């Protein structure tokens, strides 16, 4: 093989590798920010899992505890749940209802989400009275707040952003579930904080708060 032919072969291989790499990147499954490490799922209700991928791509979902399928209300999870992305790249599937517990692992193709709990999930929506953070009430409840931590209570704060062109289909990538620790507590909704504490003391199961509050906004927002 002469040098010119050899260089052509190398160039062809390089182009092929680039195309394969691009295909792999495009085919990567993406989950919404709500479905992420540390999330809390609603107990004893069917659980929807959704996301995006290349049109026609097969998506496999496993829900695990200690590398084995966990028990669920009324039976056991199947080893694998599957879905296929539609022509717009959208896919979804439903897991069966589960009892409270955790932590669990959720595997979606090559994505692995850890530290997942099953308990009660509450939407904390409203105006400034719901938005008011714990940091604003520490003068009145300093001792109580500084003495309490509970990683079975978690909050996801929906950021105050808006889109005047179309409804939002996802949250920014930086949005994450945060456990109730001294590091995170000041950003919890104060009303949500005391409510979650009371609910945990009553039921002794994980509590998830989705804090979607914004002062001065109407309820339809």
Predicted regions mapped to residue ranges:
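Sec/Tat signal peptide C-region and signal peptidase I cleavage site
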Residues: 23-27
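Bacterial N-terminal signal peptides that target proteins for export
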Residues: 2-13
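Cell-envelope and extracellular/periplasmic
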Residues: 28-221
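Intrinsically disordered/low-complexity terminal segments and short unstructured peptides
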Residues: 6, 21, 67-69
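Bacterial N-terminal signal peptides
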Residues: 12-22
């Amino acid at each position: 093989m002469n040098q010119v032919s050899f260089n052509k072969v190398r160039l062809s291989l390089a182009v092929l590798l680039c195309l394969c790499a691009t295909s792999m990147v495009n085919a990567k499954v993406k989950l919404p920010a709500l479905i992420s490490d540390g999330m809390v799922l609603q107990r004893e209700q069917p659980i929807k899992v959704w996301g995006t991928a290349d049109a026609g791509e097969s998506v496999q979902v496993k829900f695990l505890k200690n590398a084995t399928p966990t028990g669920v209300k009324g039976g056991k999870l199947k080893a694998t749940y599957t879905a296929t992305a539609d022509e717009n790249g959208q896919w979804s599937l439903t897991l069966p209802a589960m009892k409270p517990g955790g932590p669990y692992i959720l595997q979606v193709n090559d994505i692995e989400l850890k530290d997942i709990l099953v308990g009660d999930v509450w939407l904390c929506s409203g105006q400034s009275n719901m938005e008011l953070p714990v940091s604003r009430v520490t003068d009145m409840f300093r001792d109580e707040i500084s003495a309490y931590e509970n990683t079975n209570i978690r909050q996801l704060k929906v950021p105050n952003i808006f889109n005047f062109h179309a409804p939002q289909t996802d949250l920014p990538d930086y949005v994450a579930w945060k456990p109730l620790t001294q590091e995170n507590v000041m950003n919890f909704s104060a009303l949500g904080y005391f409510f979650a504490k009371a609910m945990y003391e009553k039921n002794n199961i994980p509590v998830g708060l989705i804090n979607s509050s914004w002062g001065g906004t109407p309820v339809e927002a």
